Amino acid sequence: MKETKILTAGDSSLLIQFGQEISPEINAQITAFVHLMREQHLEGVTDVIPAFTSLLINYDPRVIDYRKLKRRLEKLLKLEVSKKASSSRIFEIPVCYGGEYGPDLENIAKHANLTTQEVITIHSSSDYLIYMLGFLPGFSYLGGL
């Protein structure tokens, strides 16, 4: 994988930086690498947390040390990994427009020189890529908005 860097992130985490720009291609690289890591069952790895352009890997330093984990990750990064997500799913998210849940709908429509129905149609007629999960349970960061 091109442009990857492995950085230290505290005393029990490594951060793999896959690039600098948020893109579906980098997201696909991260997703594929997460799948590869799960298949490898790396001893000592306690969690993998994908983000927009990076992957945080938490590990137990009593089980695997920094240097050994870094070497293993470098080897995995050299493998040609299929960038096709193996388990893509579509989630339908209910949306409320206008009223107390969307008091700015009319201002958005006016600013865009559209009707409120056109804003709703444009917003609800697309599929959006989930780049990562956020700080609240179920809070997704979407691309393509």
What are these regions (language model features)?
Residues M1-L145:
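Conserved "landmark" site that anchors the functional core of diverse proteins
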